[in-house]
């Protein structure tokens, strides 16, 4: 486990480049900062400034090396590296509320933006007119779209929203891609087709994620539940009411294992038994370390004033938390190995820090932990 504190401000979202040498983060404002690893330090190398409102989503396309950002100014920008400068291209989303999340499709020919306008904007590049255009998925979304994730085929799109639903839509754009092959979620996939809709959640759906082969989708809700739908089992949904505070992010690390994190400030493991069709709690992944009590240095006292509005000792300042992160974890991303066999994953949080977790090290450190 490696932890780096970038900022005093919260990190609202992040994205990695292809070779994981650079990370783009938003310091909870209208800017995006790109850091590069230099020895044991992270050095800021670029600053992207174009949004007028807070940046709410970042995604970095690995092959085309383009960054897409969205924000509360209701716009998205596609950033292209020309020389040593990132150049933005405005994408008109045709929404009247804040954009909340953005994701490149795996084929990188389009991206999806969820918003408070109760629509999902599917944006693609029109070569003839040399601009980005978008189509809207509207029905039956009834509230803000908080999270998105693409199926590996770049056609199906999972969306979690504030109407307590996780849905899967077809985002097939005939102008830029071939007709999709049938999937376990369905064979007819015209644009905007609803392929799946959950009914088991009772809270805002904060995070959603497809498995590596796309036959399973998992989501976490504000009622502290974790759910998984299996298309190979007639879209049967397994639901687990966790004992944690609400989870904000989730990702598959194998076909049957999930890592989620949120307001408890540490990642937790969930496993899925396909034979029984059940989810189970696999354990906490952040091992608490026993540390001796000591006084605060002047530097720590001022950091606590900035981060936690407290200058008191460890218990009052949140330093008494035995987790690596000292505030809510807002995002999880797979670093290496992919969703099928993840070997490393990354978390960023409201404490302004970033942690890199090694799956094998976690397994050896936690005797009862088994990742299947």
Curated annotation (Swiss-Prot):
InterPro entries: ARPC1 (IPR017383), WD40/YVTN_repeat-like_dom_sf (IPR015943), WD40_repeat_dom_sf (IPR036322), WD40_rpt (IPR001680)
Gene3D superfamilies in the record: YVTN repeat-like/Quinoprotein amine dehydrogenase
UniProt keyword Amino-acid biosynthesis, yes or no: no
Keyword field: Actin-binding, Cytoplasm, Cytoskeleton, Nucleus, Repeat, WD repeat
GO molecular function, one term: actin filament binding
Stated role: Component of the Arp2/3 complex, a multiprotein complex that mediates actin polymerization upon stimulation by nucleation-promoting factor (NPF). The Arp2/3 complex mediates the formation of branched actin networks in the cytoplasm, providing the force for cell motility. In addition to its role in the cytoplasmic cytoskeleton, the Arp2/3 complex also promotes actin polymerization in the nucleus, thereby regulating gene transcription and repair of damaged DNA.
Subunit structure: Component of the Arp2/3 complex composed of ACTR2/ARP2, ACTR3/ARP3, ARPC1B/p41-ARC, ARPC2/p34-ARC, ARPC3/p21-ARC, ARPC4/p20-ARC and ARPC5/p16-ARC.
Name of this protein: Actin-related protein 2/3 complex subunit 1B
Organism (species): Bos taurus
Gene label: ARPC1B
């Amino acid at each position: 486990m490696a932890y780096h504190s970038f900022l005093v401000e919260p990190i609202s979202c992040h994205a990695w480049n292809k070779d994981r040498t650079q990370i783009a983060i938003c310091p909870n404002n209208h800017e995006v900062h790109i850091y590069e690893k230099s020895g044991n330090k992270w050095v800021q190398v670029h600053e992207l400034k174009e949004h007028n409102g807070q940046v709410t989503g970042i995604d970095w396309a690995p092959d085309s090396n383009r960054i897409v950002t969205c924000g509360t100014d209701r716009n998205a920008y596609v950033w292209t590296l020309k020389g040593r400068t990132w150049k933005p291209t405005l994408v008109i989303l045709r929404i009247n509320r804040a954009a909340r999340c953005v994701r490149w499709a795996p084929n990188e020919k389009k991206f999806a933006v969820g918003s408070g306008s109760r629509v999902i904007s599917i944006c693609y590049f029109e070569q003839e007119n040399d601009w980005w255009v978008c189509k809207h998925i509207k029905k039956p979304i009834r509230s803000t779209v908080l999270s998105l994730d693409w199926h590996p085929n770049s056609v199906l799109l999972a969306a979690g929203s504030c109407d307590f639903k996780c849905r899967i839509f077809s985002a097939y754009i005939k102008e830029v891609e071939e007709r999709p092959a049938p999937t376990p979620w369905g064979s007819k996939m015209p644009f905007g087709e609803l392929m799946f809709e959950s009914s088991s959640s009772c809270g805002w759906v904060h995070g959603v994620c497809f498995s590596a082969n796309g036959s399973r989708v998992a989501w976490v809700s504000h009622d502290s539940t974790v759910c998984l739908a299996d298309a190979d089992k007639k879209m049967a949904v397994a639901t687990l009411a966790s004992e944690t505070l609400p989870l904000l992010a989730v990702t598959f690390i194998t076909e049957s294992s999930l890592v989620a994190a949120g307001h408890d400030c540490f990642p937790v493991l969930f496993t899925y038994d396909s034979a029984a069709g059940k989810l189970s709690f696999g354990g906490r992944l952040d091992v608490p370390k026993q540390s001796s009590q000591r006084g605060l240095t002047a530097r720590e006292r001022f950091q606590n004033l900035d981060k936690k509005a407290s200058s008191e000792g460890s218990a009052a300042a949140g330093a008494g938390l035995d987790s690596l992160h000292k505030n809510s974890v807002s995002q999880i991303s797979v670093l290496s190995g992919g969703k099928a066999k993840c070997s490393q994953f990354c978390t960023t949080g409201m404490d302004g820090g970033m942690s890199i977790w090694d799956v094998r090290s976690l397994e050896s450190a936690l005797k009862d932990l088994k990742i299947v």
